[in-house]
Amino acid sequence: MTDVQGKLQHLFNPRWQRWVRFDIAGLEHYPRTGPVILAGNHRSYFDFFVLAQLVRRGGRPIRMMAKKELFDVPVVGRICHAMGGIPVDRHFTRAIESYAAAIVALEAGEVVGMMPQGTIPRGDAFRGPVLKGKTGVARLAEASGAPVIPFGLWGTDVIWPREAKGPRIGPRHWRRPVTVRVRIGPPVQLPGGGAVADTAAIMAAIMDLLPPSSPLPPLPPP
């Protein structure tokens, strides 16, 4: 067990394991060595617990890029810090510094995780079948040459809805465990026609890993 895996083991409350099941498939697509950009959809703060599970099962730390405010969220922030996360200040100059830190991590053969949607979608964007992504993942892939490994997850919003202050776990909320599902796909074949075209390919690969029902309720507030 690596130091990072040990920290995450400590952070993941054992009682939660009675009420959450992680169904993760596609780990054969997750490279065991070399630089990797891991890109997936974003539905809940509980998504970061899923990434912690990927670290535990995949055996590789994930340097998660996330908006700097998340590093101050209880438990979630501790997970981000434990994984050596890269805080992103959306102010232009500081965002460039975060991007540079991600390049350095990839050049060192590390895994950098990103959620190209940038934030948990609201309203119709949360429920809709089409995921819209920003171009950061594509630009990072072009600059580093690292492969983009897509993942799709669902069920996290049931455990930690956007409007909730924390995860809804335990007999007060559920009579039986809730299953969170994750599907990891093969490297995205980027068309190379620029960041916009590459982003479209990345988002399509993520959507292909999701079931048709995953964008449905519960619906966050507008």
Protein language model regions, located:
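Catalytic core of membrane glycerolipid acyltransferases/transacylases, capturing the structured
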Residues: 18, 32-92
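Residue-level signal for beta-strand positions within conserved beta-sheet cores that form or flank
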Residues: 20, 60, 178-180
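A secondary-structure boundary/capping signal
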Residues: 26, 41, 66-67, 115-117, ...
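A transmembrane-helix-recognition feature enriched in membrane-embedded lipid enzymes
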Residues: 1-26, 50, 74-83
